[in-house]
Structures are given as C-alpha cells and as structure tokens.
Amino acid sequence: MHDQLIKTTACTLILLLFTCGLCMALEIKSRYATIIYNEEKDLHRFNEEFYLGKYSYLLRKDDIAGVSDEVRFKTDLIVERVKSILDMFPENLEFRIEICSSEREIQKVYKLIYRKTTNYSAFYAPEINTVFFSVNDMELATVAHEFAHMVMTSYFNVSPPVKIHELLSRYAARHITD
C-alpha cells in the first residue's frame, strides 16, 4: 500500500512536471475526459488522425463548432462504444488524455513513469488514470484499445491480471468498427 502511494505520488509529480515543462498546456473537457495538449497544431493533428471510420456520419456539422468540439465528440463516442463492446459501464467515469507531439515524447513519458524503454505510440497509465497518445500514430483501434484499459480499470474494484486486460483490450480494438 505504501509503495503504491509513493508510486502514484511520483507519477503525478512526473506528469505535472511533464505537462508544465512543455510550456502552456491547454485543455478541453469532454463528458468523460480532460484532454491536455501543448499546441493547437497538436490538437488539429490529433483530430485529423482520429478517424472514426464508419461512425464518421455521426459528425453532424451543425452540432460541431470547431476542432475542440469534434475531439470531444469523438472521444465520448469511442468511450461509449468501448463500454458497450465490453459490457462494462463504470459509474463516474473520468480520465485524462495527454496528446504528445511525437512518439519520442510518448517514449520519454513512459520511461519517466515506468523506468523502462518502449516503442509504444500510445499507452494507458492506470496509476495516474491517463491515456497518452502520439499525434503521429493514431488509429481507431489504438484508441479503443487504450480506452478499454481505462474502462476496465474503472470498472473492476480489483483489476484483472495483465493478460486478461490485454485480451479484452484487443477484443475492444478488434470490434470497434462492428
């Protein structure tokens, strides 16, 4: 318990330093997520790469005033779809999304949090309830996969084993376009 508290505190401080260290972090809020980004161009690129596939028809232009609204809508839509695919509906679901400007930035954050190297372009850090995405490698399946990790963490009182988490996240990614 003490180790978990130390790790959570350390991760939170790292995240704050990361976000603050990159100048003026901007944020938008959706129903479920607080979305953090450093520059408008990152949000625009994230939005362009965050293609909804067959769900694109749901983007009614009269309901969307700009890129921020579109990102909010897409985020909430995919969270709802993932919850439905997994048949898991956690109460008071809230999480953070950090939009990083490159895969290198993702890898630096991962190393700061976990003290390990990786080649991930996205990951979910349950200790700080944050999904990290690179604007350079956004696919709907990746978004669904990471959101599935977040939904499961919020749903279960005791998180399932890593292999079960991964299996269900892959299931959500595979079925996001059904």
Locations of the language-model features?
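Bacterial N-terminal signal peptides that target proteins for export
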Residues: 1-11
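Bacterial N-terminal signal peptides
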Residues: 11-20
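Boundary at the C-terminal end of the N-terminal hydrophobic targeting segment
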Residues: 23-25
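Acidic/histidine-rich, surface-exposed loop or edge segments in extracytoplasmic proteins
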Residues: 29-67, 151
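Auxiliary, metal-adjacent structural segments of Zn-dependent hydrolase domains
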Residues: 65-127, 137
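Short pre-active-site segment immediately N-terminal to the catalytic Zn-binding motif
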Residues: 126-144, 156-160
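Active-site recognition of the HExxH zinc-binding catalytic motif
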Residues: 141-154, 166, 170
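Post-HExxH zinc-binding segment in Zn-dependent metallohydrolases
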Residues: 159-178
